[in-house]
Amino acid sequence: MITTKNRIGYIQRRYDENNVPHFKFIVAKIKRVNIGVKSTKVYTKEFYPLDLEDLESTTEMFDTSKGIIIVQEPFILKDDEEEYFQAVVDRWNEEPPKSIFD
């Protein structure tokens, strides 16, 4: 179960005028969790209200398929993963990653 002690991670991708991607790793503290009849919403200061099912499915993709990192999708951040994702984003900013479709 998710609580306000958990954090949300997000890898943002933007392009400059030369069409070169730049990445930023954002960590957001959970302000509150709203359990409703139809869905459970997670609220942070940085993001719009997030659906818990979407967060859990993205986090499960990270856990089950090692080596694949999804950008522009929020996920539940584990305590030991923050340094890893920051290192990946720093490496991507030095040398942009290739798409899996290349």
Q: Regions from the language model: what does each represent?
A:
Residues 5-13:
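A short beta-strand micro-motif
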Residues 84-91:
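Charge-rich, solvent-exposed alpha-helical interaction surfaces
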Residues 2:
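GIY-YIG nuclease catalytic motif and its immediate N-terminal context
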Residues 15, 20-80, 84:
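Acidic, low-complexity, intrinsically disordered interaction modules
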Residues 92-97:
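Short arginine-rich
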